[in-house]
């Protein structure tokens, strides 16, 4: 059986997750569910990045210890992932003892190889990013250096610290980016490659003085320092599947891994991560999937921008996790930023889920119950419907294997529209025995339900159980293979949402938290 390891970034739990976190996590979950559906053995990892100055300050603000703070926030994140029906196999925390041991051992090994050394450093530092910015990387606001991500003033820091010899890996990183297809879409690899060629690679700090950042994993040979949060966090991808602790499981899954990240952390996940892996004699990941930003009010959605959209708003408004997941995945774009408005999300939900899919399921279910007492036996499927089903399945599998979830959903919608056109043309409600038409419609609904199941797992389960069919791999789907549909109810899956009040500008914006 083919193995696949899927990861999200691990998230800073300094605040509850919002739509930006959900955007990444739901996409990774859809990939995991799809790959399980087609028969692959999947291990899906997500979790929290729990060390560093930002966490330390957040805990101080609440008057509790960092450990108490991250314990509380781990529970919060897990609750949100339950809310969105995220099917992770393991939730990693960088305060887990096994992870801390792996990080400590990796740091020690690189020091013994001469790849980590001690030196003085001075530079502009962003607490939120937990990294230094060199000239050319930060932006000037009123002649003061600001973080290009968070738009906050940078802090000038001078300290003696430990460095990783990133500069020694320029040729390796260049070759990896230019000669492999690891980074997807490939435009992101070109972006990093251009920067590497223009600027070269500088050695990077991998530790902080303990008197400034006490909340971290101690440097194993120097207790006056803690390990830099990015070095610590990146290693979760290997510690989470057994590196240095369970070699059999590590070998089972690595390097057949799909990392899913946002483009804001591209540099660390290419240049730094690939170099760390090479330094530790670990093969690079099979795929680094990079997605664009969700934009609201012209800015990347984020707490610092004050434009976050709460996850609970999405789940409540779109009738549960399935509706929220579908809207996010239809918006999903790997290489173009997406402007988010309630009007846009409402339109997607109402037209595609409530009307095209939900209404069709309801109409066919009610008709079958009324006309044939819910029992629809196998008949020859209408040729046009059969062709539409097979075309949609073929394109859907191609798109999903190519990691293009939104495009795959468009193929499902085309089939849904064809089925709605068919029911209006053949008018089964006017026939005394519409079994042939109903069977064709039910085969189409079965195909749509199978294809939507990674995105709308709860609704797909309800429909398959209510109509009496199994959710099979889209690769194994055979039109006309169901002997009998036994419809026990016609569920109302997705109730339409009503327009909210408009803002003074006339355009509706989601609530922020």
Feature roles, as predicted:
Residues 1-40, 45-46, 98-102, 149-150, ...:
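Structured secondary-structure scaffolds
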Residues 1-14, 30-204, 243, 247-248, ...:
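Conserved, charged catalytic cores of large soluble enzymes
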Residues 125-129, 292-294, 344-348, 379-384, ...:
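A glycine-rich phosphate-binding loop feature that marks nucleotide/adenosyl-phosphate handling sites
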Residues 1-3, 43, 47, 119-124, ...:
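Basic, alpha-helical terminal appendages of large translation-related enzymes
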Residues 67, 355, 403-410, 454, ...:
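Short, solvent-exposed positions on alpha-helices
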Residues 345, 349, 381, 397-400, ...:
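Non-transmembrane, amphipathic alpha-helical segments
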Residues 354, 358, 386, 390, ...:
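Generic structural concept
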Residues 366, 405, 450:
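Aromatic-residue-lined binding/catalytic grooves and analogous aromatic/hydrophobic interfacial grooves
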